[in-house]
C-alpha cells in the first residue's frame, strides 16, 4: 500500500481535497478530526491537568485552550507532548486497517506534515494550494477568525511556496471541484507506479 501525505496551509482547500479522495474510494485519515475526537475523550483529563480551566463537561473547550497556547510556544509544546502520542496511535491504527482492507493507496491528511517531519513517513506528498487572496478570504469568512489569529496560525506553518517546491504533487483548488477531481485521478494513476519511499 502506498501512503500519500496530504497537506497545505490553512484555507487552501485541503479538507475538500481529502473529501474528494474519499469519494474516489481512498481511505483518508483526518488528523484534525482525530484531534477533535480525542479532545472529547481521552485527551481531556491530561489537557485539564496541564491547562486548568480549559475543559467543560469533560471535554476540551478548543476556544479556551487556543487562548492559552496560541501565543505561547512553551505551552504549545506542552500541548503537543500530550496530543501527539495519542494522534500517532490513532494514525497507526488507521494504516493497519487500511492495509488490512487491501486498499492500494491511503491518504493521511495532516496540516503540519512538513513541520512535524511527517513527510518521512509517507511515500509521496500532495500539497493543496490556492491564491493568497482566495486563502485569506476563505479563512476570514470562518466564525471567530481574525487577522491576528490568522497571522499567528500562518506563522507556525511553512510558506505555501516552500511546500509546493517540496511536494511530489500539487493540487490547485482555485478553479472549482472538477479540476481537483481530475488532478486526483492523475495522482492516483501515478501513485500506482511509484516505489515505496517512506522510512
Swiss-Prot record:
Residues 3-199 form the DPCK domain. PROSITE patterns: DPCK (PS51219). It is found in: Cytoplasm. Pathway: Cofactor biosynthesis; coenzyme A biosynthesis; CoA from (R)-pantothenate: step 5/5. ATP binds at residues 11-16. Its EC number is 2.7.1.24. Keywords: ATP-binding, Coenzyme A biosynthesis, Cytoplasm, Kinase, Nucleotide-binding, Transferase. This is Dephospho-CoA kinase. It is an enzyme of class 2 (transferase). GO terms for molecular function: ATP binding; dephospho-CoA kinase activity. Signal peptide: none annotated. Pfam families: CoaE. It catalyses: 3'-dephospho-CoA + ATP = ADP + CoA + H(+). Belongs to the CoaE family. GO terms for biological process: coenzyme A biosynthetic process. It comes from Rhodopseudomonas palustris (strain BisB18). One of its GO terms (cellular component) is cytoplasm. The keyword Nucleotide-binding applies. It comes from the Bacteria. Gene3D superfamilies: P-loop containing nucleotide triphosphate hydrolases.
Amino acid at each position: 500500500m502506498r501512503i500519500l501525505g496530504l497537506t497545505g496551509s490553512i484555507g487552501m482547500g485541503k479538507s475538500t481535497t481529502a473529501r474528494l479522495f474519499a469519494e474516489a474510494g481512498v481511505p483518508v485519515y483526518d488528523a484534525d478530526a482525530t484531534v477533535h475526537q480525542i479532545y472529547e475523550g481521552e485527551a481531556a483529563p491530561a489537557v485539564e491537568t496541564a491547562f486548568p480551566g480549559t475543559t467543560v463537561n469533560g471535554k476540551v473547550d478548543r476556544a479556551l485552550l487556543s487562548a492559552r497556547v496560541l501565543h505561547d510556544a512553551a505551552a504549545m509544546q506542552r500541548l503537543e507532548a500530550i496530543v501527539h502520542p495519542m494522534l500517532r496511535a490513532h494514525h497507526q491504527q488507521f494504516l493497519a486497517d487500511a492495509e488490512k482492507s487491501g486498499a492500494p493507496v491511503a491518504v493521511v491528511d495532516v496540516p503540519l506534515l512538513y513541520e512535524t517531519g511527517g513527510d518521512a513517513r509517507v511515500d509521496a506528498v500532495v500539497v493543496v494550494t490556492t491564491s493568497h487572496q482566495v486563502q485569506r478570504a476563505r479563512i476570514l469568512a470562518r466564525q471567530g477568525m481574525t487577522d491576528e489569529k490568522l497571522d499567528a496560525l500562518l506563522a507556525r506553518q511553512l510558506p505555501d511556496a516552500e511546500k509546493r517546491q517540496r511536494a511530489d504533487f500539487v493540487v490547485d483548488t482555485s478553479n472549482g471541484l472538477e479540476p481537483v477531481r481530475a488532478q486526483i485521478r492523475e495522482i492516483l494513476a501515478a501513485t500506482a507506479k511509484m516505489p515505496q519511499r517512506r522510512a
